[in-house]
């Protein structure tokens, strides 16, 4: 890696920077009018995320509007599933629906090996266009869903309130679930390598539903497979920073640190100062402003950013929300978040 790296990549690598980089999870999406207008013309989420021209355009919308330090691929954690033989649809206001939820060993044995350059070439295309056009004015981010969260979707068949189906599999037929998780870990590792090869400079793993596990079960069904993904990626790209985000992770921070990731993205339910004490010093911190705060006034947003930043001092740090930005968030408040974030200095 040459010098003149973009700010977010420099910070993620632990280099000295003048201010913390700032971006937002789900920064491209429903809170932006320009996105809603485009959605009216292209109502299918899968088309918006799998047509390279549309995905590129949407990925660039927040960059053009707010100039965040990170430009993240517009996609979905379920996007790689069809390449493994699992079809899905995303229904507006209902979320993802899996066509044939996984229930038995035959389905798992019939899963295809993911070959990203074949089934996900549109992702490669978008990332290389972003890398070229963003031109190091920001860092290009890729992302994936972690094995446990993907398994939760494909076993439950949709979003769930209590995850009874996947937990039933975990506690009645653990061997079956481990086989599925292992398949996902290898596939997702390959997918991340493909994203990095295509232009992603930093990548984030979302294990959105791992916070539904007890710490004991996290150590069996989530942590080892996160680590497997990280190991696969680091073997080929040891320098590429990896961020891990789990919603509801306050009870898991020490465990997350053992997966080999470079940065832990915190949700807003943990005090960032406390998190810094619990997470080993070499690991960076990202987060963790409550996205609900962006429904407040500008002063409260600025004040919370200052507090969060001051509590993170002395650490490798990236300013972000503690969850994706919420639909209905006023765009001018998102702008305040980015503008004020960029005024912070070390």
UniProtKB/Swiss-Prot annotation:
GO molecular function: uroporphyrinogen decarboxylase activity
Main location: cytoplasm
Entries under Gene3D superfamilies matching the protein: 3.20.20.210
Subcellular location: Cytoplasm
GO BP, sorted A to Z: protoporphyrinogen IX biosynthetic process
Site (Transition state stabilizer): 76
Positions bound to substrate: 26-30, 76, 153, 208, 323
Record-listed E.C. numbers: 4.1.1.37
Coiled-coil stretches noted in the UniProt entry, renumbered to this chain: none
Gene Ontology CC annotation, any one: cytoplasm
Keyword set, alphabetical order: Cytoplasm, Decarboxylase, Lyase, Porphyrin biosynthesis
Pathway connected to this protein: Porphyrin-containing compound metabolism; protoporphyrin-IX biosynthesis; coproporphyrinogen-III from 5-aminolevulinate: step 4/4
Reactions that this protein is recorded to catalyse: uroporphyrinogen III + 4 H(+) = coproporphyrinogen III + 4 CO2
Function: Catalyzes the decarboxylation of four acetate groups of uroporphyrinogen-III to yield coproporphyrinogen-III.
Subunit organization: Homodimer.
Protein family membership: Belongs to the uroporphyrinogen decarboxylase family.
HAMAP family in alphabetical order: URO_D
PANTHER family (alphabetical): METHYLTETRAHYDROFOLATE:HOMOCYSTEINE METHYLTRANSFERASE RELATED, UROPORPHYRINOGEN DECARBOXYLASE
Protein known as: Uroporphyrinogen decarboxylase
Record organism: Prochlorococcus marinus (strain MIT 9515)
């Amino acid at each position: 890696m040459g010098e003149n790296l973009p700010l977010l990549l420099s910070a993620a690598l632990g280099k000295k920077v003048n201010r913390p980089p700032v971006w937002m999870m789900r920064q491209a999406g429903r809170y932006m009018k320009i996105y809603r207008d485009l959605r009216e013309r292209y109502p299918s989420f899968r088309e918006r995320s799998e047509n390279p021209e549309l995905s590129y355009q949407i990925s660039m919308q927040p960059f053009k509007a707010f100039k965040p330090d990170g430009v993240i691929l517009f996609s979905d954690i379920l996007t790689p599933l069809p390449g493994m033989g699992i079809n899905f649809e995303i229904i507006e206001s209902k979320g993802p629906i899996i066509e044939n939820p996984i229930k038995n060993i035959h389905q798992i044995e019939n899963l295809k090996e993911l070959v990203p350059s074949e089934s996900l070439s549109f992702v490669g295309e978008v990332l290389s266009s972003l890398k070229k056009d963003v031109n190091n004015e920001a860092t290009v981010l890729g992302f994936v869903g972690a094995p446990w969260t993907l398994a939760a979707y494909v076993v439950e068949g949709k979003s769930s309130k209590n995850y009874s189906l996947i937990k039933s599999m975990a506690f009645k037929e653990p061997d079956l679930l481990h086989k599925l998780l292992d398949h996902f870990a290898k596939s997702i590792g390959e997918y991340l390598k493909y994203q990095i090869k295509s232009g992603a400079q930093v990548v984030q793993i979302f294990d959105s539903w791992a916070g539904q596990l007890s710490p004991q079960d996290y150590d069996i069904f989530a942590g080892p497979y996160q680590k497997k993904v990280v190991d696969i990626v680091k073997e080929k790209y040891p320098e590429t920073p990896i961020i891990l985000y789990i919603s509801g992770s306050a009870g898991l921070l020490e465990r997350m640190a053992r997966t080999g990731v470079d940065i832990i993205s915190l949700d807003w339910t943990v005090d960032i100062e406390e998190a810094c004490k619990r997470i080993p010093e070499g690991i960076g911190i990202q987060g963790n402003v409550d996205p609900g705060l962006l429904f407040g006034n500008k002063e409260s947003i600025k004040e919370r950013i200052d507090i969060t930043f001051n509590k993170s001092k002395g650490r490798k740090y990236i300013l972000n929300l503690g969850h994706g930005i919420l639909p209905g968030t006023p765009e001018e408040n998102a702008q305040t978040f980015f503008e004020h974030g960029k005024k912070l200095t070390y």
